[in-house]
Amino acid sequence: MDATFWAFIALVIFVVIVVYMKVPGMIGRTLDERADRIKKELEEARTLREEAQQLLAEYHRKRKEAEKEAGDIVASAEREAKALLEEAKRATEEYVARRNKLAEQKIATAETDAINAVRASAVDLAVAAAGSILAEKVDAKAAGNLFNDALAQVKSHLN
C-alpha cells in the first residue's frame, strides 16, 4: 500500500464526512439563498428603475406643463401690457386734444378780448377826436342845436 492509496482513502473518507455532514446541501442552500437574494435585489432594482422612469416621465410632463403655463403667463402679460400701452396712448391723445381745444378757446377768447379792446380804444379815440373837433369848430349856438337834435333822437327811440 503506497501513499497514493492512502491519499485516495483519505479523500473518500473526507467526501463521506462532507456528505454525512450535509455540506453539499448547505452549500446548495446557501447558493440558493444567495441566488434568491440576488433575484430579489434584481427585482427590487427593476421596480426602482420603473418607478424612477415613471417619476422622470412625470417630471418631464410637469416641466412641459410649467413651460406652457409660463408661456401663457408671458403671452397674457404681453397682451395686458399692449392693452395698457394702447389705453395710455389713447388717454394721452385725448388729454392733448382737450388741452389743444382749451388752448384754442383761450386764444379765441384772447383774440375777441383784444378785438373788443381795440374797438373800445378806437371808439374812445374817435369820441375824443370828434369831441375835440367839435369843440374847435362848433360855437355855442350850433352846440345847442346839436344837443336838441340828439335829445329828440333819444326821445324818438324811447317811444
Swiss-Prot record:
InterPro entries the UniProt entry points to: ATP_synth_b/b'su_bac/chlpt, ATP_synthase_B_chain
Chief location: membrane
Entry GO terms, CC: plasma membrane; proton-transporting ATP synthase complex
Species per Swiss-Prot/TrEMBL record: Brucella canis (strain ATCC 23365 / NCTC 10854 / RM-666)
Superkingdom of the source species: Bacteria
Record function comment: F(1)F(0) ATP synthase produces ATP from ADP in the presence of a proton or sodium gradient. F-type ATPases consist of two structural domains, F(1) containing the extramembraneous catalytic core and F(0) containing the membrane proton channel, linked together by a central stalk and a peripheral stalk. During catalysis, ATP synthesis in the catalytic domain of F(1) is coupled via a rotary mechanism of the central stalk subunits to proton translocation.
Family: Belongs to the ATPase B chain family.
One Pfam family linked to the record: ATP-synt_B
Single GO MF descriptor: proton-transporting ATPase activity, rotational mechanism
Keyword Ion transport set for record: yes
Subunit structure: F-type ATPases have 2 components, F(1) - the catalytic core - and F(0) - the membrane proton channel. F(1) has five subunits: alpha(3), beta(3), gamma(1), delta(1), epsilon(1). F(0) has three main subunits: a(1), b(2) and c(10-14). The alpha and beta chains form an alternating ring which encloses part of the gamma chain. F(1) is attached to F(0) by a central stalk formed by the gamma and epsilon chains, while a peripheral stalk is formed by the delta and b chains.
Transmembrane feature ranges: 1-21
Protein name according to UniProt: ATP synthase subunit b 2
Lipid bilayer topology: Single-pass membrane protein
Record PANTHER family: ATP SYNTHASE SUBUNIT B, ATP SYNTHASE SUBUNIT B', CHLOROPLASTIC
Subcellular location: Cell inner membrane
